[in-house]
Swiss-Prot record:
Gene name for this UniProt entry: rsmH
Task of the protein: Specifically methylates the N4 position of cytidine in position 1402 (C1402) of 16S rRNA.
Binding site for S-adenosyl-L-methionine: G35, G36, H37, D55, D101, Q108
EC number in record: 2.1.1.199
This protein's UniProt keywords: Cytoplasm, Methyltransferase, rRNA processing, S-adenosyl-L-methionine, Transferase
Reactions performed catalytically: cytidine(1402) in 16S rRNA + S-adenosyl-L-methionine = N(4)-methylcytidine(1402) in 16S rRNA + S-adenosyl-L-homocysteine + H(+)
The UniProt record lists the keyword Cytoplasm: yes
Name of this chain's protein: Ribosomal RNA small subunit methyltransferase H
Highest taxon in the source lineage: Bacteria
Family: Belongs to the methyltransferase superfamily. RsmH family.
Region (Disordered): 285-306
GO cellular component: cytoplasm
Annotated organism of origin: Aeromonas salmonicida (strain A449)
Amino acid sequence: MTQAAEHITVLLHEAVEGLAIKPDGIYVDGTFGRGGHSRLILQHLGPNGRLIAIDRDPQAIAEAAKIQDPRFEIVHGPFSGIVSYLDERGLLGKVDGFLLDLGVSSPQLDDAERGFSFMKDGPLDMRMDPTSGQSAAQWLARADVDDIAWVLKTFGEERFAKKIARAIVHDRVTEPYVRTRQLAEMIARVNPSKEKGKHAATRSFQAIRIYINSELDEIETALNGALQALAPEGRLSVISFHSLEDRLVKHFIRKHEKGPEVPRGIPLTEAQLAGGRKLKSVGKALKPSEHEVTENSRSRSSVLRVAQRLAE
């Protein structure tokens, strides 16, 4: 394993403050990573508080094992499994706060062997959990032009998706794409777009990573699971890093603030209408401060949204 840079947790204090932690509350950190949020949550908890952390990355699980605290528990798996994890523990509907820090972490990006970054050469893997599922190289070796182009367009909003997809399928006949630099250099050659401050392969690498890890489906499942997990007045605190993630989170909160669509003409009282609302936004969406962006450039695109569970 190559040496990874120390992970700087983005919007650390803001995300944890959004949980409005009760000393004896029950909390879930759905993305343990390197433990920045979890460690701060534990500092706010009293002796009877409880924190369950989740991560599907074996390296994160190894880091979590260093926390020797009876209030803390780590679960190895995707955060989309929140309902089953809590059901096993008899905690559905009893959680006071659920935190998600989406996307890929700095240690994952900086470790060339994980295959997430086009800046360092490594095997073209991109799996959050390298022990499960197909790697990016395996998928690119089998997918057809239309499938590859759809992924690049849908998850990367890549304007030249078809051109890149055709090049991948053409080239793999003689030399399959198995290294990150190999793929990044090809994309830079065939992609005429020159976005300021952005490598030509940025959108494609993001798209492939999202697809390989089913990231948007995972997020949607986890958000729906949060509705079952949270107690009345429980908080949902979510940090996203690109427009696709943030759009999903924003629309989810708005949908459950409004409640179900009711056809015109059906006589319902204000109380009955309010009964269908499951969430309310807490404050406005937050971006990192200029100081944080200066200290950690990867925080630039992050957005924090907080919502509170309403009683039904």
